[in-house]
């Protein structure tokens, strides 16, 4: 019997007031990507807007969306073209920076 693929428990907004905990498969990093083992993830004001209103300004949640985009973790795998991080390095992610 094949081993089950590892999964990541995620907080997903489906629409205004509709939050669900769902498992998502853990992806393999692409050549320029890094896979982090998450230590903490913040839920910020934009996430609250998506949950309460299903939107922020012109951006409307039209399909399920994983919340939380301010995070810290440890690199477990790095893509073949990544030169600035290695497995074991601690990192923080902030997509707006």
Curated annotation (Swiss-Prot):
Reaction(s) catalysed by this chain's protein: xylitol + NAD(+) = D-xylulose + NADH + H(+); L-iditol + NAD(+) = keto-L-sorbose + NADH + H(+); keto-D-fructose + NADH + H(+) = D-sorbitol + NAD(+)
Cofactor field: Zn(2+)
Molecular function via GO: D-xylulose reductase activity; L-iditol 2-dehydrogenase (NAD+) activity; zinc ion binding
Localization: Mitochondrion membrane; Cell projection, Cilium, Flagellum
List of residues binding substrate: 50
Protein residues bound to Zn(2+): 44, 69-70
GO cellular component, one term: motile cilium
EC numbers for this chain: 1.1.1.-, 1.1.1.14, 1.1.1.9
InterPro entries: ADH-like_N (IPR013154), ADH_Zn_CS (IPR002328), GroES-like_sf (IPR011032)
Transmembrane segments: none
Cofactor details (free text): Binds 1 zinc ion per subunit.
Gene3D superfamilies from the UniProt entry: Medium-chain alcohol dehydrogenases, catalytic domain (3.90.180.10)
Main location: mitochondrion
Family label: Belongs to the zinc-containing alcohol dehydrogenase family.
Name this polypeptide is given: Sorbitol dehydrogenase
Originating organism: Sus scrofa
Upper lineage: Eukaryota, Metazoa, Chordata, Craniata, Vertebrata
Gene name of the encoded protein: SORD
